[in-house]
């Protein structure tokens, strides 16, 4: 762009975008006229100090980090011409400030995602879950009775503390209430057959001819 005085005698040419001049003029509240889409600007009074300040302002503005809409700053990249023609997204992604210590960037910087350390699932996790479920079910007290005991009182088993031993408390019962030991289910038929075969000999079958030999004696 070119800046000229009101009289048209003095002029200065700058390799600075016109948008940056508009920001500088708004900050200084300068009155000017422009034409040819900002390629030429005319001031009422062309001051050397004003031009020096404008150059310093352009240098400071150009040295700022490449902004984008993600950073929430102004579009100085398009104004200053930085970024080698890259868009705001590409400039923000390649900017050093957008990178984290781990080498990646978050979703707020250029759309990249920071890798989050996720704890690996333990192979013992299903087993622990099953144990927890068994403890919940074990809180219901289970009543058992051991077969073969004369008279036992059912004991409550509490599995909250883990797998323990079954402890049964025996109490003395009157003789009239005493019962015979429980017979396993599979031996009931066998005992009946033994009685029928040899009821006179204590329930055991004698060899063939044993009774005849005893009577002969």
UniProtKB/Swiss-Prot annotation:
GO terms for cellular component: host cell nucleolus; host cell nucleoplasm. Transmembrane segments: none annotated. Induction: Expressed abundantly in the late phase of the viral replicative cycle. Residues 202-217 have a biased composition (Polar residues). Keywords: Host nucleus, Late protein. Residues 68-110, 170-217 are annotated as: Disordered. Its main location: host cell. The keyword Transport does not apply. It comes from the Viruses. It is found in: Host nucleus, Host nucleoplasm; Host nucleus, Host nucleolus. Belongs to the adenoviridae U exon protein family. Might play a role in viral replication since it is associated with viral replication centers. Seems to have an effect on DBP localization. This is U exon protein.
């Amino acid at each position: 762009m070119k800046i000229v005085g009101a009289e048209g005698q003095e002029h200065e040419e700058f390799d600075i975008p016109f948008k940056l001049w508009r920001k500088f003029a708004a900050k200084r509240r300068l009155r000017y006229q422009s034409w040819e889409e900002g390629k030429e600007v005319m001031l009422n009074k062309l001051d050397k100090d004003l031009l020096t300040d404008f150059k310093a302002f352009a240098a400071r503005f150009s040295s700022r980090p490449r902004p984008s809409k993600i950073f929430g700053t102004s579009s100085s990249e398009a104004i200053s011409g930085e970024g080698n023609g890259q868009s705001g997204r590409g400039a923000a992604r390649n900017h050093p400030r957008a990178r984290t210590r781990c080498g990646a960037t978050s979703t707020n910087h250029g759309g990249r995602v920071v890798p989050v350390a996720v704890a690996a699932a333990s192979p013992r996790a299903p087993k622990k879950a099953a144990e927890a479920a068994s403890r919940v079910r074990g809180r219901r007290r289970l009543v058992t009775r051991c077969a073969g005991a004369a008279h036992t009182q059912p004991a409550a088993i509490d599995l909250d503390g883990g797998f323990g031993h079954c402890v049964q408390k025996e109490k003395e019962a009157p003789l009239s209430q005493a019962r015979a030991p429980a017979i396993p289910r599979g031996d009931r038929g066998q005992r009946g057959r033994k009685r029928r075969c040899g009821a006179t000999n204590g329930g055991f079958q004698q060899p063939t001819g044993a009774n005849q030999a005893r009577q002969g004696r």
